[in-house]
């Protein structure tokens, strides 16, 4: 799957911003057919970072949400700033 088709958009909520600051996690809405491995590869390729783990869930709206934890040597705040979240 094309990395740019896997990631649909970042999530910008109070919880998502809190996770960026406290747990070094980014939150995205992703393609419903994407696997955790697809999501990990897409994030690593697009943002040039290393991913520690990916947690996913299906929202009541039917969208797939991914919580992506970055390795400690990378900053989620930096990526969020590049995306224009701050």
UniProtKB/Swiss-Prot annotation:
InterPro entries: Nucleotide-bd_a/b_plait_sf, Ribosomal_uL23, Ribosomal_uL23-like, Ribosomal_uL23/eL15/eS24_sf, Ribosomal_uL23_CS. PANTHER family: 60S RIBOSOMAL PROTEIN L23A. Belongs to the universal ribosomal protein uL23 family. It comes from Pyrococcus horikoshii (strain ATCC 700860 / DSM 12428 / JCM 9974 / NBRC 100139 / OT-3). Keywords: Ribonucleoprotein, Ribosomal protein, RNA-binding, rRNA-binding. GO terms for cellular component: ribonucleoprotein complex; ribosome. Binds to 23S rRNA. One of the proteins that surrounds the polypeptide exit tunnel on the outside of the ribosome. Pfam families: Ribosomal_L23. Part of the 50S ribosomal subunit. Contacts protein L29. It comes from the Archaea. Coiled coil: none annotated. This is Large ribosomal subunit protein uL23. GO terms for biological process: translation. Gene3D superfamilies: 3.30.70.330. GO terms for molecular function: rRNA binding; structural constituent of ribosome.
């Amino acid at each position: 799957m094309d990395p740019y088709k896997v990631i649909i958009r970042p999530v910008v909520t109070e919880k998502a911003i809190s996770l960026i600051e406290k747990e070094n996690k980014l939150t995205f809405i992703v393609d419903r057919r994407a696997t955790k491995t697809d999501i990990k590869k897409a994030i690593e390729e697009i943002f040039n970072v290393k991913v520690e783990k990916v947690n996913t869930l299906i929202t009541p709206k039917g969208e797939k949400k991914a919580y992506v934890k970055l390795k400690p040597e990378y900053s989620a705040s930096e990526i969020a700033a590049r995306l224009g979240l701050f």
